[in-house]
Amino acid sequence: MPASFDTETLTGLVLAHLNADPASLHFAPISTGKHNTSYRVDSNQGRFVLRIAPPDEAGFLFYERHMMRQEPALHALIRAQTTIPVAEVVGHDFSRTRVERDYLLMTALPGTPLSDFPGLTRAQLRRALRQVGELLRQLHALTAVEHLGEEAYGYLGAHRPMEPQPTWAAAFRIMWNMLLDDVVACGCYAPGEAQRMRDLLDRHLGHFDRPVVSRLLHMDVWSQNVLIDAAGNVTGLVDFDRALWGDVEIEFAVLDYCGISEAPFWEGYGAERDESPPALLRRQFYLLYEVQKYMPIRVWRRNDPRSAARYKQQSLALAAGLL
């Protein structure tokens, strides 16, 4: 569960970056956050969101440690190069001098999370999904060559959980193995079970070794991270902290899992999906990458080994289809 902070601490964090009247500050917890501790901040300077990262001893996947540190640069890039509605980061501090956590302060976006919208109609949902497709098409137009200066792949933000790789196949192999290390560390896979998963990817790695443009991927687009207005128009995309640079197919697999990639999404995205046998095989691996992460999450952050066991069974069933 996210922690809570007293008003004095929150006020100090905000005033370090915002010239606001302290008496005008009002804080309200944001309940949809599952990882960070977040607050809506009302002030005489406007409305903001304060996000405070978990403590270092919290259970992290390999790419989650310090992942907030990549958000300021990503938000600046997306705001400059696209029309995607993302918040402006007005301040951040990763020095741990004010609080023993990373934190950032950003402008508040209008709208309600799609997951929380009361009485959502089919028309509103179709409009929202179509617009998500349009917005992700813009995001995916941002390439590593143009914006990072090299065709590199992987988690390339300031948190640097891995070294940049020259090919997508090399990057995904590292990501796969590091995630399996986490699944072993949380006790859900025995080393032998993890080795079989490692060998499974290696047997099929040739299907990943192909020309792939390294594109910016959100990797966490689900209903809680899409804000909409009363008509179903998208007013914000949030939580870019899990972003990576690589093959758009892995983004599509996450969208499948999160229920976003319905027909209206593809209408908005404006491109056909590769349905070739190699693409379908890669899709299964990308789905496995998404599903397996929930084992350490359920053990380390939810203390729910029973749920983790269900994700293990789902993962083993998916892997059996790749043998």
Regions from the PLM with identified roles:
Residues 20-22, 82-86, 141-155, 183-190, ...:
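Surface-exposed helix-capping loop/turn segments at secondary-structure junctions
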Residues 1-25:
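Juxta-kinase regulatory segment immediately upstream of eukaryotic protein kinase catalytic domains
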Residues 16, 186-196, 202-203, 207, ...:
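A conserved long alpha-helix in the C-terminal portion of kinase-like catalytic domains
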Residues 51-59, 111, 243, 247, ...:
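Short glycine/proline- and charge-enriched loop/turn segments
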Residues 168-172, 181, 214-216, 222-281, ...:
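Active-site Asp-x-Gly
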Residues 117-122, 157-215:
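ATP-dependent phospho-/nucleotidyl transfer catalytic cores
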Residues 31-41, 49-50, 89, 139-141, ...:
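Active-site acidic catalytic loop and adjacent metal/ATP-binding pocket
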Residues 28-173, 178:
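ATP-binding pocket architecture of kinase catalytic cores
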